From Swiss-Prot:
InterPro entries: PSII_PsbX, PSII_PsbX_type_1_subfam. Keywords: Chloroplast, Membrane, Photosynthesis, Photosystem II, Plastid, Thylakoid, Transmembrane, Transmembrane helix. The lineage of its organism: Eukaryota, Cryptophyceae, Pyrenomonadales, Geminigeraceae, Guillardia. GO terms for cellular component: chloroplast thylakoid membrane; photosystem II. It comes from Guillardia theta (Cryptophyte). This is Photosystem II reaction center protein X.
Length: 39
């Protein structure tokens, strides 16, 4: 694997991590908080 490809994959994973983590946390918090309304 070339250094540029490795750097590209690393940045892709980092971007994915930065995007997915807050969204996942927000969804989790919302699903925890409105559990009463959806029974």
């Amino acid at each position: 694997m070339t250094p540029s490809l490795s750097a590209f994959i690393n940045s892709l994973l980092l971007g994915l991590f930065i995007v997915v983590l807050p969204i996942g946390t927000a969804l989790l918090l919302v699903s925890q908080s409105d559990r009463v309304t959806r029974n």
